[in-house]
A protein has these predicted regions:
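Trp/Gly-enriched beta-strand surface patches
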Residues: 1-76, 592
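Substrate-binding groove/exosite segments of carbohydrate-active enzymes
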Residues: 48-51, 57-71, 78, 82-83, ...
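Beta-strand elements of well-folded, non-transmembrane domains
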Residues: 86-90, 577-579
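Acidic/polar loop patches that form or flank catalytic/metal-binding clefts of enzymes
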Residues: 206-209, 335-337, 349-362, 409-418, ...
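Alpha-helical scaffold segments in carbohydrate-active enzymes
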Residues: 271-282, 322-325, 342-353, 422-429, ...
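Hydrophobic, small-residue-rich alpha-helical packing segments that form membrane-like cores
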Residues: 295-329, 338-349
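Short, surface-exposed recognition loops and adjoining beta-strand edges that mediate ligand/DNA contacts
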Residues: 349-392
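Non-catalytic C-terminal accessory modules of carbohydrate-active enzymes
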Residues: 442-448, 464, 468, 475-603, ...
């Protein structure tokens, strides 16, 4: 127990050192005063004499060193295991500021000793379930580099990047620095990219949507892209991000589809409409409601883009399509029709005006008048930190999300394909030895990667800040888009380049940083598993689908997970954890009704066609 610390201090809490091993257990709760390391010497003299600790009569140090020992006799050629556990409970977590918001786990356990009492008896079960997950995943047919990228980045969900409030809401930094969190508020335009949380922990993903729509959103529909804490403060401020806000609408659709939870959708539908309608505010992102974002659009590049561009444009198209589908489900016919009209207008306009024959570009407008600026004119008329004619690595991020959500193409299919080819052509660099980067270096020397932006048609004098960098979350987004376009070889080249950089020798293989270690966007790597397997699941329609390519595919929908084994004319769907509602299984272009309407852990069904 922390006796010398105020009970409201973040350092106040409990730690327990315990063992589950059998044998002669001994301990001491204090040590000799630690002058010139005498405490360690005193411990060693005690322990080395006979392997048994002797309790001291009273603590003699303000910082006493406790010790725990287990004594066993090991026979020749035999093996013995000694198991020790360190448990803790520190309830006074700070949020993004000095305010104490608390920890969810502290509501589940009174102190560190109760953690030990309740968790240690479950360790065998937890280890078995964890190993089942890992072994099943590793036994799938995905390329080794994809399995590594997807699995290793799950470490972010067990890092200090994320935490849960006492209410159960999952919150996240963008990443973490060595001693503090980086970029607070479950930043929407960063967390938009990751796919691990919704497809592995659907309930937690729903809590993030609850924060975004019901705490961080103001009455006029402005969603703060960084939610302050405590949650009662989340809507303070006026910081909206066009990509973050539109992406949250798509995520709401995704969570509804994966869960099939109509109550969840009904509860949030009013807020979804409000959040989308904010884009139609006079002089806002799409103030004239023509399906095109001409206004000032703050985004994940930490700047404002002025004028129509593919990054925000396709997020907007995806939000319109997602809102249309949710509106039909809520029997909101007029809103559904409006979303469809704006989608068709906006999609057609971007294909006609932003697609330059190779990729989609940014048409810059005057920040004051919203009038288009002559891009061939003087640079001094062009606002700083824009994209312009650059080829952006994640210009199709909205399409990335749309594919995963099953919302179809947001633009001309041929244009989308050509754009992915151009991103590989212009942004992939096989050797960075001669590359100049005025910002942070996440790649160097002879390493390879996808540039944030390339400029085959001429660079702006002052482009957006990160244009010369390479960041893995964006690379995964592009690679997944390539997979959906049938460019699997190119996609694997990009993913392999990432993992070659994070190989455990040059960099930490379990932490792919941007602004901080264990960066949330790197969990976009999980989407490569979804794309390669052709996986899509709708709990609303009770249908799951996979590619027709023979193989063994790990799948997860956020509430259950298992394997699907596909061969010529036959597929076996197996649930290893959770419960799956299923009525139809689609393999390639073939859809077959299942005999069972529900599969629980340990059950499977084989279909033939």
């Amino acid at each position: 127990y922390s006796e010398g610390v105020d009970k409201q201090d973040p350092a106040w809490g409990t730690i327990a050192l315990v063992t589950s091993s059998t044998g002669q257990v001994s301990y001491r709760t204090s040590s000799k005063a630690d002058s010139w390391n005498n405490a360690i010497l005193n411990f060693w003299d005690d322990f080395s004499e006979d392997g048994v600790m002797v309790e001291r009569e009273q603590p003699s140090d303000e910082d006493p060193m406790a010790s725990l020992a287990v004594k066993k006799t090991i026979a020749p050629q035999a093996t013995e295991t000694f198991v020790f556990y360190l448990t803790w409970n520190f309830p006074n977590r700070k949020g993004w500021s000095s305010t104490i918001v608390g920890n969810y786990y502290s509501r589940q356990f009174a102190d560190a000793w109760e953690v030990a009492e309740k968790v240690i008896p479950r360790m065998k079960q937890l280890e078995e379930e964890t190993l089942l997950f890992v072994r099943s995943f590793l036994n799938s047919s995905y390329p080794e580099t994809v399995k590594e990228a997807a699995l290793f980045n799950l470490a972010t969900l067990r890092s200090q990047t994320v935490f849960r409030l006492p209410s159960g809401h999952l919150m996240g930094w963008e990443g973490i620095m060595d001693r503090f969190g980086s970029c607070q508020g479950s930043c929407t335009h960063v967390w938009n990219y990751e796919m691990a949380t919704p497809f592995l922990f659907g309930g937690l993903a729903q809590t993030m949507r609850d924060v975004e729509f019901n705490y961080a959103t103001k009455e006029n529909g402005l969603m703060n892209f960084r939610a302050d804490l405590p949650l009662s403060e989340a809507a303070k401020g006026n910081s909206a991000a066009a990509d973050g806000q539109m992406g949250c609408i798509m995520k709401m659709y995704r969570e509804w589809q994966l869960s099939g939870d109509y109550a969840f959708l009904r509860k949030n539908w009013g807020q979804v409409k409000k959040v989308l309608s904010y884009a139609w505010t006079e002089k806002g992102w799409d103030g004239n409601q023509d399906g095109v974002m001409e206004g000032s659009q703050h985004n994940t590049m930490d700047v404002n883009y002025f004028g129509p561009n593919p990054q925000m444009g396709f997020w907007y198209m995806g939000a319109l399509r997602a809102a249309e589908e949710m509106a039909w489900a809520m029997k909101d016919k007029s809103f559904a029709k409006k979303c469809r009209r704006l989608f068709e207008q906006g999609s057609r306009w971007m294909d006609e005006h932003l697609f330059n024959g190779e990729y989609y570009e940014h048409h810059i407008t005057d920040p004051e008048t919203f009038e288009f600026i002559n891009m061939e004119g003087a640079d001094d008329k062009i606002p700083a930190f824009q994209l312009g004619k650059g080829c952006l690595v994640d210009q199709l991020v909205g399409q990335y999300m749309a594919h995963i959500c099953g919302l179809g193409y947001l633009g001309d299919k041929k244009h989308i394909h050509t754009t992915m080819e151009s991103i590989m052509k212009y942004n992939y660099v096989s050797d960075f030895s001669r590359h100049f980067n005025n910002m942070r270096s996440y790649v160097m020397g002879e390493e390879a990667g996808l540039l944030m932006a390339s400029w085959p048609k001429g660079r702006l004098e002052v482009p957006f800040p990160y244009f010369a960098e390479v960041m893995t979350g964006f690379e995964y987004c592009a690679a997944v888009g390539m997979i959906y376009e049938g460019m699997t070889d190119e996609a694997l080249t990009c993913i392999r380049s990432i993992r070659d950089r994070f190989d455990g020798a040059k960099r930490n293989p379990f932490s792919e940083p941007e602004c901080g270690h264990h960066y949330a966007r790197s969990m976009a790597s999980w989407a490569s598993v979804i794309a390669l397997s052709g996986f899509h699941y709708s709990a609303v329609d009770k249908q799951m689908q996979f590619t027709s390519a023979p193989g063994t595919y790990f799948w997860s929908n956020g509430y259950a997970w298992g394997m699907c084994r596909i061969s010529d004319g036959e597929a076996t769907l197996e649930v290893l954890r959770g419960t799956l509602g299923i009525e139809r299984l689609r393999i390639g272009d073939v859809t077959v009704k299942t005999k069972k309407k529900q599969l629980t852990a340990g059950e499977s069904e084989t279909i033939k066609w």
